[in-house]
UniProtKB/Swiss-Prot annotation:
The UniProt record lists the keyword Ligase: no
Protein keywords: Cytoplasm, Cytoskeleton, Leucine-rich repeat, Repeat
Protein name per the record: Protein phosphatase 1 regulatory subunit 42
Record's subunit section: Interacts with PPP1CC isoform gamma-2; the interaction is direct. Interacts with actin, dynein, KIF5B, KIFC1 and tubulin. Associates with microtubules.
Pfam family, any one: LRR_4
Xref: CDD domains: PPP1R42
Compositional bias (Basic and acidic residues): 335-357
Function: Regulates phosphatase activity of protein phosphatase 1 (PP1) complexes in the testis.
Recorded name of the encoding gene: Ppp1r42
One GO biological process term: regulation of phosphatase activity
Tissues expressing this chain: Testis-specific. Expressed in spermatids (at protein level). Testis-specific.
Organism whose genome encodes this protein: Mus musculus
Annotated region (Disordered), positions in chain: 329-357
Length: 357
């Protein structure tokens, strides 16, 4: 196995020391070191490389990140395809902008607190135990919320990326070959990531859902590329018009439904059986006069109720007759006596005699 030391760096660098120039002075000039694919398994003290800004250590056998505390000017660190299982000892790299950790054994994204300048984080294709997925430490996500612009989490068996909504300045998300299933979850995420303009989700089950692309384009106005394909203005405008037409039809349908419901409710109330109390009004106008001759005609022709006895019929006839006689007598005037039998009345005779005299 090989350990990365300053001597190894000096031997493999293209530096040509000047006369009377020390090793420390030479190492201080180094800004880029490339020791990729050299079977390196550990990192020695690199404090003499104070101006180191880019370090390539990918495709090695490094299992632990150490001795980078004094490389405070480091901006790019390439550690992909090593044997790293834990992200640690990076808090002093205040100027770090790009960190590549893909192809390792990392199960949790953590230990990045304090990296306020980190813009790109690549943690794709971690070699995880079967059935496990890559997780995110909330503290790390909070610390990267304002700085991170590019995140690569591809091929990590991830089925939920809701936690990423805190990354308010994220503009490029790469999450291909995961287990994302639901379009609704992606819509909610896109509503939060207002600056996201490029997203790659190829290889996820969600890509096979109906209207997947259309729904995401309609949700995010900032998105310009989806799954490697550009979103053109004409495509977005067409989808917006289609959605507006669809929404208008829904609103119209709801209004018609409400109107029909109201009409049916009115008819239903109208048809409801109510108990109506009858109101009787007194008869107004001239009363009908029943003459004795009419009653006789009624009885002769048998129109009276069969239930009435002969005795009842006689009584009724007599009562009506008496009533008619009384009314006739009271209405007589001195000149109006047409019935001979009334002359037998003494008072009537007296009145007639006085009139003649």
């Amino acid at each position: 196995m090989v350990r990365l030391t300053v001597d190894l760096i000096a031997k493999n660098s293209n530096l040509k020391p000047r006369k009377e120039e020390t090793l420390a002075q030479c190492l201080k000039k180094i800004t880029h070191i490339n020791f990729s694919d050299r079977n390196i398994d550990s990192i020695d003290d690199l404090s003499l490389c104070r101006n180191l800004s880019v370090l390539y250590l990918y495709d090695n056998r490094i299992s632990q990140v150490t001795n980078l505390n004094y490389t405070t000017n480091l901006t790019h660190l390439y550690l992909q395809n090593n044997c790293i299982s834990c992200i640690e000892n990076l808090s002093s790299l205040k100027k770090l902008e790009k960190l590549y950790l893909g192809g390792n054994y990392i199960a949790v994204i953590e230990g990045l607190e304090g990296l306020e300048e980190l813009r790109e984080l690549h943690v794709e294709s971690q070699r995880l135990p079967l059935g496990e997925k890559l997780l995110f430490d909330p503290r790390t996500l909070r610390s990267l919320a304002k700085s991170l612009s590019t995140l690569n989490i591809s091929n990590n068996n991830i089925d939920d990326i809701k936690d990423l909504e805190i990354l308010e300045n994220l503009n490029h998300l790469i999450a291909v070959d995961n287990q994302l299933m639901h379009v609704k979850d992606l819509e909610l995420l896109l509503k939060k990531l207002m600056k996201l303009w490029k997203m790659d989700l190829n290889g996820n089950p969600v890509c096979l859902k109906p209207k997947y692309r259309d729904k995401l384009i309609l949700t995010s106005k900032s998105l310009e590329f989806l799954d490697g394909k550009e979103i053109k203005d004409m495509e977005r405008q067409f989808l917006m018009n289609w959605k507006a037409s669809k929404d208008a039809k829904k609103i119209s349908k709801k209004r018609r439904s409400r109107s029909e419901d109201a009409s049916n409710s009115y008819i239903s109330n109208f048809e409801t059986v109510h108990h109506i109390v009858p109101v009787y009004y007194p008869q107004v106008g001239k009363p009908k006069v029943i003459f004795f001759s009419d009653v006789q005609r009624y009885l002769v022709h048998g129109n009276a109720s069969s239930k009435c006895s002969q005795e009842d019929k006689t009584t009724i006839t007599e009562d009506i007759g008496n009533l008619s006689l009384k009314e006739s007598e009271s209405s007589l005037t001195k000149n109006d006596i047409h019935e001979p039998h009334l002359l037998q009345n003494p008072k009537v005779k007296e009145n007639l005699s006085e009139k003649k005299e």
